[in-house]
Amino acid sequence: MKIGVFDSGVGGFSVLKSLLKARLFDEIIYYGDSARVPYGTKDPTTIKQFGLEALDFFKPHEIELLIVACNTASALALEEMQKYSKIPIVGVIEPSILAIKRQVEDKNAPILVLGTKATIQSNAYDNALKQQGYLNISHLATSLFVPLIEESILEGELLETCMHYYFTPLEILPEVIILGCTHFPLIAQKIEGYFMGHFALPTPPLLIHSGDAIVEYLQQKYALKNNACTFPKVEFHASGDVIWLERQAKEWLKL
């Protein structure tokens, strides 16, 4: 089965990594709109247009399924993209919510949603969580993480300063943290380490990783099995510098 993965840049590598590990598909076409990253600071109309333009990119590749591996596009462009597509299109928000439903029974558990400004303002996660009965929800726009990750700054003083800026003012400490941007799993260990090192948490917070969640979602929805193929063929495309994107993929995904 040949599928597409669409992201604003390199954040979708976190989803791609989970897909490659599961070996569900024979061929994956990855498209990063790196010339226009970040999406999270742009208005909803622009993001919808970017999503429709991504559909145009994938048409000649004849994919059978498209994964929108970008939370901002999933929140604001997914429905519009689905209207104009003849193939199934899956976003990352619904799988993440279902992952929480499976793992978190306490409807009053404090849940913190991290995301870009556009994702947080869309209330997509808040609304989806409330539909499942979760009541104790807080959210935080952590858009500065995106350019740091795009520049491969995954540790060090600059990232620590950024986490301190965002997390120090928190009044309610989370039991669950939704990594509501596919860039964020790339610094998941640093986020967990910050909370354990700076707050008196009895146990590490549960981190919801959209890449792992979407693999579980696809397995259930389409009856897919792990190791269905030996190793998927991956082809990279970008609206910006594709050589840079491929170099980042080799570094992060060990291709």
Swiss-Prot record:
User: Part of which pathway?
Assistant: Cell wall biogenesis; peptidoglycan biosynthesis
Q: What class of enzyme is it?
A: isomerase
Task: Cite the InterPro entries for this sequence.
Answer: Asp/Glu/hydantoin_racemase (IPR015942), Asp/Glu_race (IPR001920), Asp/Glu_racemase_AS_1 (IPR018187), Asp/Glu_racemase_AS_2 (IPR033134), Glu_race (IPR004391)
Instruction: Give an example GO molecular function.
Output: identical protein binding
Annotated EC: 5.1.1.3
Keywords carried by this UniProt record:
Cell shape, Cell wall biogenesis/degradation, Isomerase, Peptidoglycan synthesis
Keyword Magnesium appears in the UniProt entry: no
Quote the Gene3D superfamilies the UniProt record gives: 3.40.50.1860
| Entry's Gene Ontology BP terms | cell wall organization; peptidoglycan biosynthetic process; regulation of cell shape
- Residue positions annotated to bind substrate are D7, S8, Y39, G40, N71, T72, T182, H183
Question: Where does the record place the catalytic residues?
Answer: C70, C181
Q: How does it assemble?
A: Homodimer.
Q: What does this protein do?
A: Provides the (R)-glutamate required for cell wall biosynthesis.
Question: What family, per the record?
Answer: Belongs to the aspartate/glutamate racemases family.
Protein's name in the database: Glutamate racemase
What organism does the UniProt record list as the source?
Helicobacter pylori (strain J99 / ATCC 700824) (Campylobacter pylori J99)
